[in-house]
Amino acid sequence: MAISQERKNEIIKEYRVHETDTGSPEVQIAVLTAEINAVNEHLRTHKKDHHSRRGLLKMVGRRRHLLNYLRSKDIQRYRELIKSLGIRR
């Protein structure tokens, strides 16, 4: 269910704002999106796994808050990010 450390590092390299960036909203949203997609795939086969479903809902809520924050701070970065991640909003 969880994404591997290698995959997480690839995502960080792709979405970071500067060389040592690991905590910008873009990076956090991209990592959360990858984790959400992994849990979503898990739930397709394990429909009764309600514990994972609750974790998924918490991740989606956290991503939504980060997206709202990014939209309020820089609308252009927000639009580029949702386009590159394929998030419909």
Curated annotation (Swiss-Prot):
SUPFAM superfamilies recorded: S15/NS1 RNA-binding domain
Bilayer-crossing regions: none
CDD domains xref list: Ribosomal_S15p_S13e
Keyword tags: Ribonucleoprotein, Ribosomal protein, RNA-binding, rRNA-binding
Disulfide bonds: none
One cellular component term from this protein's GO annotations in UniProt: cytosolic small ribosomal subunit
Classification via SMART domains: Ribosomal_S15
MF term (GO), any: rRNA binding
Biological role stated in the UniProt entry: One of the primary rRNA binding proteins, it binds directly to 16S rRNA where it helps nucleate assembly of the platform of the 30S subunit by binding and bridging several RNA helices of the 16S rRNA. Forms an intersubunit bridge (bridge B4) with the 23S rRNA of the 50S subunit in the ribosome.
Family to which the UniProt record says this protein belongs: Belongs to the universal ribosomal protein uS15 family.
Quaternary assembly: Part of the 30S ribosomal subunit. Forms a bridge to the 50S subunit in the 70S ribosome, contacting the 23S rRNA.
Protein name: Small ribosomal subunit protein uS15
Native species: Staphylococcus aureus (strain NCTC 8325 / PS 47)
